[in-house]
């Protein structure tokens, strides 16, 4: 959701809350009438909107970090030539893998700091678990990925999603992480949309209480 749209929603919330609070300071008859009208729970809706938007922003940051690993994968077996193009340089990929591992730990750190409403906590935890599993897989394959002269074959199995020759050194976990982030982003968008819908829903009058 764009920043301007979110600002408009939050301003609307502020106006709603201000109007509700001003009514409570009026006369008794006005307050009695207000109590017969059931409106949205503004405090709860405000929290859902704030939480879901924070999650969306964080997911975008993490997705950008994840994309940087995809870019690193394009450089497997490559070197910079003097004309600015990339030439072949086989089996020297240890720095690429170290970079991917550093990024994966940063992703885990960002997800660890993320809090969300009840409907998002489970998906946040799932994404964090996937990130940890990817980092662990790279670390556990230190004998092949943490040595001087990491082969193109092993590097591709670690971080190249399109590798058809194998994905057993990290790619499987990387794909799961990507999927979990998509699921988290979708859930946050749905919560935000539902909260806005709830905010703009018509006020319903309660049935008068029997004497």
From Swiss-Prot:
Signal peptide: 1-18
Name the record gives this protein: Outer surface protein C
InterPro entries: Lipoprotein_OspC, OspC-like_sf
Keyword terms, alphabetized: Cell outer membrane, Lipoprotein, Membrane, Palmitate, Signal, Virulence
Subunit structure: Homodimer. Interacts with tick I.ricinus salivary protein Iric-1, Iric-2 and Iric-3. Binds human (host) plasminogen.
Pfam families reported for this sequence: Lipoprotein_6 (PF01441)
Family: Belongs to the OspC lipoprotein family.
Membrane topology term: Lipid-anchor
Principal subcellular localization: membrane
GO cellular component, one term: cell surface
Positions where lipid (S-diacylglycerol cysteine) attaches: 19
Keyword Membrane on entry: yes
Additional remarks: The causative agent of Lyme disease, the bacteria has an enzootic lifestyle. Larval ticks are infected with bacteria during feeding on infected hosts (mostly mammals) which retain the bacteria during subsequent developmental stages. It is transmitted to the next host when it is bitten by ticks. During tick feeding (which can last for several days), bacterial migrate from the tick midgut to the salivary gland where they are transmitted to the host.
Lipidation (N-palmitoyl cysteine): 19
Cellular compartments annotated: Cell outer membrane; Cell surface
Organism: Borreliella burgdorferi
Gene name per UniProt: ospC
Known role: Major immunodominant protein in mammalian hosts. Required for initial stages of mammalian infection. Inhibits macrophage-mediated phagocytosis of the bacteria. Binds human plasminogen; this probably confers an extracellular protease activity on the bacteria that allows it to traverse tissue. Interaction with tick I.ricinus salivary protein Salp15 protects the bacteria from antibody-mediated killing in vitro and in vivo.
